[in-house]
Amino acid sequence: MRDPDKVKSGPICDTVAVIVLEESDDENALPDVLHEVQSPHTSDNIPTSSIKKFARPRGWYNQSVSSPSEFFYQILTTERGTRRIAYVLSTWEEDEKTLNFKAVSIVLISQNFHPKAFKEILLEISNDLRTPEFSSSSELIRFLTYELVEEGSTIEIRTKTLHVELGFELIPISPVTGKDVAMLFKMLGFQNVIKIIHALLSDCRIVLASSSLMRLSRCQNAILSLLYPFEYVHSCVTILPDSLAEVLESPTPFLIGVLSEFVTSFGDENIVVYLDNGEVHVPDHAEIYKSDDYYYNSLHQRLRDVMFTTTSQEDLSIPNEERIEVDDFILDKKLRACFIYYFAELLYGYQYYILYTRIKGNFEKKLTTSLTFHVGAFRGFRKLTDMMSSSLLKSVYFQTFILTRALPRRKHDLFDEISCFKELDQLIFKQNSTSSESKKIIEHISCELIQKERYMEKCSARKQEIFTKIHWISGKELAQNNNSIIHTVKPKMRSNVILQAMLPVVNTHAEYHANQFEAYAHRIEALRNCLAAIFEGKVAFASKSLDAVKSSMRFAPLRIELCRLLNQKCSHDKLTDKQFEDIALLMNAALQAECEEDKDGVVRSLMYLSNVYSRKVAQGMQQYMYTAVQEHKVWKNQRFWTSCFYYEVHEMLFSEMLQKDRKITESLWCHTLRPCAMEMINTDDTDQEELVKQENEMIQAQAKHFANILISLQIPLSEEFFEHEDAHRSVLNEKCKWIVNTLDSILGVTGRINGLSLSRIQTYVEAHVESLRDVYVEMSTGEHLKKGNFDPVLAHGEFLISDPIDCYLLTSIEESEMSLNRLENLLPADGSLFLTNYRVIFKGKSVDINATNGTIVQTIPLYSMESFKKLTNKKLIPTQLIEKGVKIEHIISIRSSCASSIIIAFDEDEINNMAIEKFLEVIETNSHNSFAFYNTRKDMKVVENGSHKFGTLNSAIRGFTKKKTDTRRIRSHSSHRGSIQLSFDKMEELDYLKKNAHIRYAVIDYPRIGLNSKIVKLRMSHSNLDYTICPSYPGNFIVPSETNESELAKVAKGFVEHRLPVVVWMNENGALLVRASAFTSIDMVKKLKKVVNYRRNASKLTGSMTGSQQTLHSKASSNEESSSNIVAGAEIKSAEVQMNYIAKLSNSSQRAVSYALPTQYADKFSTFNDGCTLTQNNANGFPTTRIHRKALYVLLEKGHGVKIPIDSNAEAIMVRSVKESELRRSLQRARQICSSEFQVENRTSFLESWNASNWPQCVSRMIELSNSIVALMNLYNSSVAICLEAGRSITTILSSLSQLLSDPYYRTCDGFQVLVEKEWLAFGHYFHKDTETSSPSFICFLDCVYQISQQYPTAFEFSYFYISFLAYHSTAGYFRTFIDDCEEKRLQSDANEFYLPDNLATINVWEFIKLRNRVSAAFYNELYEQIGDIVIPSSSIPQIHMWPFLAETHLKYGSPYDIEPASHEQQLVDPDYEEEEDWSKLNNTDIDERHLNRRVRSPERDPANMDMIRLLQKSYLTELFDASDRKTTTNGESNGKETIHELTPFTVGARPVQCCYCTNILTRWSKAVHCKKCRIHVHEGCVNRNITIGNITHTWDAKPFEDIKMPSGAIQIGTPQAEKMLHSPNNTLTRESMSPPTANTIPPLCTGYLSKRGAKLKLWVPRFFVLYPDSPKVYYYEDFENWKTAEKPSGCIDLVDFKSFNLEQTGRRGLIELHMKNKTHRLLSENINEAIRWKECIEQVIRD
């Protein structure tokens, strides 16, 4: 044990050295150490050779002209981690031979901070070295390095030209700043300084930039001093040399100063402080924590008062006080006092929360006192909730702080004194930062700092110039003492006294915690009454207040009081079933509200109480409470168990010392009780061996006790654990390993001797499992089986959002009626209703045990919820419940748009009205949130910045590519208008887009149907990329090629919601299918009539039908006519645009064919009946032999017709379609016919009700109209434009069905996906028009598909389940595919989700189906055969069957369309059910061969051109992504001729250059290329085929480094001879162990420069690495030349002990971590692609 009265001593300086750069031709030559003197009394010296670069940060070079000398200091770190200060005097020496001036630096290293004094000493030494006749420097250096001085003394040194006085401290108690802090605040401002200090404490990387050496030194010293009482523990470099600029890309925290004249790029992730102009640059992604608002704002206020003292006097006409300028020295100390006061407030009372887990230490290993800090208890006591306090108390800063200040008998400093001020207790509680007491504290702190520094350093200023020649001879010995130096050691500055523990007064805080219980007195009284009623068996009284008491557990005083009351009632440890359930409910509610830090000790208290309370389940068998409280995350938090164990050992130690137990305080912790640990620690060494033995026994006993508690809370009492052997074994092994690891980490800190092995833990666990097995058997079969104790199987990402509620599930039809689903005869069922973020789940068992003993599950998607309805008809109550005596008061029907209704009933005696209303309220609140975007739009807070707010498709892709590691960009070479040009070299760029992005857009289908043909007068328009013309349309669509971009906006104004006519499909005969909304109101019709009248008087547009040919106008003539037809007046002009556009659509077919319809087909396809002008029957009822056709037929709603001129070659057809409102009502009636409430009120038959719903008529009418459209396009060869209503619903149904009937491709799985994406998603269908109901149009479309598949069972590749699956999930909200109503909103949603973690992101329905197809054929139609003809289904009502999806009820496993939960439910019920493989983890890019072989592909129109079609599709997508960017960049720019420059390899010289792409620095180790013409330099990793600057494109053909011919030197060293070392019987080491492989014919597998972390200074140093394919070692050299010239490697990394490989990206660079058995190697690459290349090569060598 150290002697408290012993005073330490040491030398003033550790090292004095002279460094000189001799003349050399090498630009990279390093200087020589001319002379060096090291103190023999210091063992932790810094080698002078390691600081040569730091002595001259601007670089070592000689010059022809002398320059003034410079002085600065560097803060360095020794190998043991202690800080040293290197004072450097840089000057110039004249060389007599060359007449140049050599660079000379005199370095003095010390641990004392006296810059002024040491500068004078260095000048004195320099002056003496230049005057050989005067040699006092030897004696001065001897005194500084050899003389021992007691700590606390003041040394005065006098010579003829020197007089300095300085204080001596081995370990400075507080920093010395002089005027540095005042200078820092004046340069940056106090807000920036506060930001910097908090950034340091948040582990940010900070770069200080300035052009001055001394400014960097002073500012870094000021910043480090403001951290007091903390010490900066990360990398700290005062001035970084120019050659080490790559350190700025280190991923670890640092504080580094750089010279702004050399470094131009400071890294995108670093905080940069520009000292010269006072600017601070903070990256957007930097996280800087700040304290609570009171402490943070108080610091601002105090700094403002100190810096601007006259603010309160400036507005007065006669100031009360005379303005006095504050000296910078005094201002410096006041500013430091504000920060000391700030940290004292944050850490006030920390002394009480230090846990001593071992006082005497392990006697055998001679360990010292072991201690930790109870973070959670301290934060709870101080009520700290901010992120900074949490981060700071767990950081390395605070751990170092505790280790140096926790011991009671030590020398106290200023912070110890300030942190124990009595005034702080009340000031923090009152939160009065501007009080007079606060100002007094700041004055006191500043006075203490001033008093210390005033006699720490005194010196006389030197004014004469130094000489220009050094005569010191290398190796010269120090001269003997010639008494030329007078030095005096004055008495100590302060008495070096070891004091007892200093503790603050926390009475005010303790009283506050005690008084807070008064604010909750009424709630505490309710809790006491409820617990009293529970323990007394008053069930009815307790149940009335149980819900309210459970809700009040969110308040901390209530949770604390619950623990106290349960602790007092321990005598009632044997509970009844009802008591057990109620207490478990309250304990779970308390644990749910507690955080993992356990601030008030509630979790620790309940941990012990759960092992006390139990209930009797059988004779001699008990179920303890810990089996009911295991589902909380805190039990899996290792930090909680560690702090809990330390606290228990801590209390055991001091209970032993006090010989009594400590009482529980107001927060269940005993920290603030006196005497505390720091007061009771005895440092006496008597009987130490016996005390250590007692401590070991105590810790071992506590470890066994905690092992039992861990086992009890980790082993589950569940069916999965006890019934399934595989799960039982895996859970058992996992829990055992976790318990062993937890105990090992705990006991390892306390210095254990013998721990608990894995075998012993397994023995304890097996014994515990055996005792639990009997309890489980009794619980699962006996009378203790809890009603409704069914845990639902949840989908991935699904979780409960409310507590389950007990209820009964009733049948949805009457018992007397014929049930469509025989499973409904199993109802009523008794169980629980669960509410998750996706579904409402009922799970239970049938009331009639004779019906079935299986589980009944029924689900409804939450997003599809339509309404609640309270049923009052008593006939709905089943007779089984009446016979059981169940009192049913409330019957609720929950209706859904995609599943059958759930009818639930509640027992009046068990569930009160409040619980029912609360549960339904939670359902209603969450029913508007889809599961697909639940994390994005509700719980997950996505950072809002500019890159997330996408308005166009192009900007969305730019947002996507920002997440990629490669900086390549997509550039299109296609023209702005006309046909799409292929860009084959851009195809692979699509791999960098978001996965499966090309599936979502309709544009990929246009090349397949021939819209890219030059014959077709169509083009793709990009005018809607910003969604301004029509927000509900896609960004690109097909329009006539004769239409201008500016004309489209005018055309759109004539249609509802601006949904103008666009082409969506083309038949093989050239007929087009056009979709649009209806024409606008009657006003627009009047405008069109005016145009018609005008055109009749001056007909300009003519069309002729001669023979079999149709004469069409050319593009030029159409433009002339359109321009000539414009007359004065806005109305006529606007309507003229509509007419011209209709005419252009009619003239845009591929070719004109015969207009005569054969007689034999006319009666079959003429089906427009009501108001249709197409059918012209003769007297016999058959069509005439020749029917005149039009090029375009426009389908309009009957009653909303528009007369189109005859000469426009188009005609309007009035049809009677189904309105969307009628479709909605029909679907609702169709769903209601199966509900019991409908059957009770309507005594009609089922078929009559089905026909009365009008749903079959709607489906029939849709098929009938689709057949007519197909007839027009295939037999009449005419184009059809569907313009009905808003163009979102009925138009979409008819357009989709027409394409489905005509094109066999759409009847395949891939084709149907494209059809839905194109017609329903891209063109803006409302799947959920409002928050209450969902659109019935998509259900009607799928019903039509089902009817067609019933008539043609072999025509579709997909199955009935596929159709029902899409129908279910179109309203369920599980997939993001059907959530938003237009392309623009989907882009925004996908962009937000792209930044979510992988566990929160969801997939679309098509990805799900593809993954499922890998393991199941449920979505495929086994009867599918290739049918290339048109399908014409019957539309008669007798042929329309009821779609079972509309009435089906699933009670066995839940909805089968929730595939994953349903399969797991089936696995739980059916033991013989074989679970399929984990298909959710499969890669959908791989194709299952069995499905490829089984599936029959539909015939394409030109199979020989399939590859071209795929390229066309990708080219269209590239055009889609780049159109907006191309429009913005080409607008207003001249189309200059493109010039191509070639990039060539480039070697960087001594001076770094800047990369013109990423703006980072190119060093001599960087792989670089440059353009000789443009004089640009680029990283090789930044080049992506080309770099365009203006009209100049720079190309680069990358050549792999491995293709370079091996140097002859490298081949020579490839076959080294085994050169034996000095022979020894035990020495077998040869040079082969450090040499590359011996095979000279094998080239290296991978080579290149990587930065390696240094061992001493922890800096990143570039090395040349070589990996051979036949050697398990990675060799590295100093540079490429060393490898080339066959030099010996500097070292190697042995891959024999390789464990794992970790790859991370830090900015532009890639960080490689090679984890070996006993060591981890960290390497930095130039870019992430280089790191990936090394990873693949290393893995290849390991595999081989």
From Swiss-Prot:
Residues 996-1447 form the Myotubularin phosphatase domain. Residues 14-150 form the uDENN domain. The keyword Zinc applies. The keyword Metal-binding applies. One of its GO terms (molecular function) is zinc ion binding. Residues 1102-1123 are annotated as: Disordered. GO terms for cellular component: cytoplasm; membrane. Probably acts as an adapter for other myotubularin-like phosphatases. This is Myotubularin-related protein 5. It comes from Caenorhabditis elegans. The gene is mtm-5.
